[in-house]
Amino acid sequence: GPTSQSPRVDEARNDQLYELEIALREIETNRATYGQDMPPWLVDRTLRNILVDVTGNTHRSEFSIDKMFSPDSSTGRLGLLELRAFEMPPHAHMSVVQQLLLRALIARFWKAPYRAPAARWGTELHDRWMLPTFIQQDMHDVVAEMNAAGYAFDAAWFAPQFEFRFPMVGTVQSMGVELTLRNALEPWHVMGEEGSAGGTVRYADSSLERIEVRVTGMNESRHVVTVNGQPLPLQSTGTTGEFVAGVRYKAWNPPSALHPTIGAHAPLTFDIVDTWM
């Protein structure tokens, strides 16, 4: 989320992508001007005020260049790019396949820089791209692109990451309709300042959770899926008869939360309703 340790460049401010595009054009212009003699610190000066979080922190960014080539100190000139959105996998094999993907991406972009225009996702960033079905589709696109570029990858190599990050809650079949529940991603936002005995604190609202509901074999005109009696706004995945929705719910009631007057929604009850019967 926007207040995490590794927010995306387009996650907190809507104008950041516009500024990033200008910065990248400037880097291209300077490369054409200086060639191999381009000063390394120019990259730092060009991007350091863009690769930041909402408060301007240069370290808390998905791509942190604090230690790449900052002229401010010797510790800032280490040639390091931190990819802070990665977490340590629970198994060495999962770590190896992540490293293999990164090395292949670097090799590919070194030969052919990636020049596709940046997408303006808007609210889809926290709607579509928090759900495992669409993230898996996106990962399959990446694997297909890498294979087309001559780097042999298999989507099955990343199945453990998918199952680890989005564990299955359960599945049920009824009337030819299959309903699958998986844990999805949900940002825990940092809230406003509050006083405490030790000074000022800012809590994170950890009360929210998200579940993905995926339905296959459903007839739109006949079946409705509900959660606690409320119909779900299912969206097509592009596959006939397959639909997906994300359910955000309040799992518990902490003393400090974003909406303190809304009670906990758990437990959740999902129903497949046949409107013809």
Write out the residue ranges for each language-model feature:
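C-terminal accessory/tail domains of diverse enzymes
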Residues: 1-277
